């Protein structure tokens, strides 16, 4: 195969403007004319990227439409890179000064001032700084809160209409605490509380004189009603009521050995007590203590039954001993 001459001249194609040597130009011209007559669809790279991913073809077309609207180039956000770089250098230098002071024992330098970015917007109500997007959301909300605290007319964020009339302003934290303290002072005094052994709160009972008198009156009315209804029966030993004992006198004492029908023993004078032996005084004192428990009036049948039961118990104990 003969090698082509590198110095051979080239000629341009009238269809695609590419250059060929004379022998190749004849072959290319016929093929290039056929390709030019065919209408090929343009290749869509967005559809190829959307296949096999979470993105949809509609999203890609939307982005391409926005790009074409802006002249084929997306607008880049303006960044204050020079200002940020200066803040970064200041922070590094301040940290180095702190490390040097800790190593040498020198006084610590003052902390660096927090620099606010120049593109931030300051809120006129709370004096805080936000970026442009956050300031659009925050400033209307902060304005509404400030008007509520001041108690003035509240303007809605959607228009210039003021909400007046039945609008009730919400109190702030300090105002709410003052209202609670005033309501507590105006109300009745709370009873003091104490803690029990288990740590639980126990409220101390404080009975007023009026409560005590009212309770006593209620008790008196109850006793009068019960005594009036059951006046015909003997209620001295009934359930829930104490027996009314007669006043004890020296002449009412009865010895245990004396019979029921026998007259009561006369009380001895101090001179008679000196003359009597000690045995008689001890027996008399014992008999007096026994009879004092029998001073209340009882039925004879009940007393006879009790004495018979005592005698039976004594006989049983003696038979067991012997």
Swiss-Prot record:
The keyword Chloroplast does not apply. PROSITE patterns: ZF_C2HC_C3H. Keywords: Metal-binding, Repeat, Zinc, Zinc-finger. Residues 276-295, 311-322 have a biased composition (Low complexity). Zn(2+) 1 binds at residues 13, 16, 28, 32. Residues 174-220, 296-305 have a biased composition (Basic and acidic residues). GO terms for molecular function: zinc ion binding. A zinc finger (C2HC/C3H-type) spans 9-38, 119-148. Its cofactor is Zn(2+). Residues 150-322 are annotated as: Disordered. Zn(2+) 2 binds at residues 123, 126, 138, 142. The keyword Metal-binding applies. Residues 150-159, 221-238, 264-274 have a biased composition (Polar residues). It comes from the Eukaryota. Belongs to the ZC2HC1 family. This is Zinc finger C2HC domain-containing protein zchc-1A. It comes from Caenorhabditis elegans. The lineage of its organism: Eukaryota, Metazoa, Ecdysozoa, Nematoda, Chromadorea. The gene is zchc-1A.
